[in-house]
Amino acid sequence: MKKTWKQKIVSSLLAATLAVSLAPIGQAKADSPQTTIETPSITKQVDANRAIEHVRFLSETIGPRPGGTQSEKWASRYVGMKLKSMGYEVEYQPFAVPDQYVGFIESPLSKSRNWQVGAAPNSLISAEAVTAPLIFVPNGTKLDEIPNEVNGKIVLFERGATVADYNKQVENAVAKGAKGVLLYSLIGSRGNYGQTFNPRLTKKQSIPVFGLAYAQGNAFKEELAKKGNTILSLKARHESNLQSLNVIAKKKPKNSTGNEKAVIVSSHYDSVAGAPGANDNASGTGLVLELARAFQNVETDKEIRFIAFGSEEMGLIGSEYYVDNLSQKERDRILGVFNADMVATNYDKAKNLYAMTPDGSTNLVTDATLNAAKQLNNDLVLQGKFGSSDHVPFAYAGIPAALFIWMGVDSWNPLIYHIEKVYHTPQDNIRENISPERMKMALDVIGTGVSDVLQKPAVQSEQKAA
């Protein structure tokens, strides 16, 4: 019997959990009287290919993971089960997130590409398919630019330059009898290819209106040019009363009093709609899981936490919720946060691994990783100023934190930088956007930095953090 999508995931989860190695890694000697140890070099313990297998599961088996959706929940369970199988105490921290409006396109191309898209909230949202031939119309902001042939068809437009422009495209298509409208974006906000989006309509429409990524819209244009026609089926879903989850794993020192200093290694595991999110940010999550494996049997005088945040792409919701719910005493316990986001791209212009803070200042985390880079004779690791990830809420709460990301920076003032063109798109997949060498370097540098902080006596680490 053919397995359903959910059954395949559950089977894979169970198989993956049962396959976890129980071999001790970097374990302290039983007769050691000290609370800190000399751990073997982290570089010999971490494996980029093993981390990328987590990336593969998240980005291919599960796929796009918009915040609060079922696919994000599957991802949280995968991460939690992996961490629990390593012996960590695992907690799922729920929090509310905004509604999601997700569109789905079935076509002859559906098997080769991802066709999850954004749906306009005030367009037709229906599980019943709207099926019709596709027609491409250039421009369309003027009614006389819309041919009568659009009647009864689904219209594909290059998205107008402004919200007002694409609203005119939609209204003109409706006036000519279109059964659906697909708007595809050409360029993203950071020089990347256009990503999926939820069109903001000024008028309620009785037909489906979807926002597509450039790769999706361009594929349809090519299909029409090659075959002359293609039939699409459009469905949409409004998901409400949503909850996302932070996955929090802890390993306390022996004879813990509950007041020990803590070190956090974090990432977010969600993605935007329509994007498999291999680099953004299954790569960070794969790194977190691989470092958790490497540190699972290491004994120190500190608590170590591995946290996978939900719904980062919706506005850092998971990390903000986590920090907001920490007492001042809990905040004071945290020595530093090593946050991994987009750590394995193969994009050649993203040539440096940066340790970024929101204000550009250095702290215990940046110092530890820059020192680690020196130990490893790695001159590609630099320090810089950047927000837009889960290190920000910690930094604003006075907790030393840094973002680790591959980027190319031409200028800091004004800020001119390079990230991969396939960021937030259906092309953010392992084949097109993941480098094992970049993943290994991130594992080595971040892992060595974490190890150095863990090995330092707590008092010395406190002084460094102050």
Predicted segment positions?
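Metal-dependent peptidase/peptidase-like ectodomains
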Residues: 299-300, 309-408, 412-413
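Soluble metallo-hydrolase cores and metallopeptidase-like ectodomains found primarily
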Residues: 117-144, 198-278, 293, 297, ...
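Noncatalytic luminal/extracellular "stalk/propeptide" segments of secretory-pathway proteins
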Residues: 44-49, 53-154
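N-terminal capping segment at the start of a domain
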Residues: 33-70, 86, 93-95, 100, ...
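Extracellular/luminal Protease-associated
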Residues: 69, 115-208, 380
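Sec-dependent signal peptide cleavage junction
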Residues: 20-35
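His/Asp/Glu-rich mid-to-C-terminal helical/loop segments that flank catalytic regions of hydrolases
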Residues: 413-466
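Catalytic-core environment of secreted peptidases
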Residues: 35-37, 48-63, 82-89, 154-160, ...
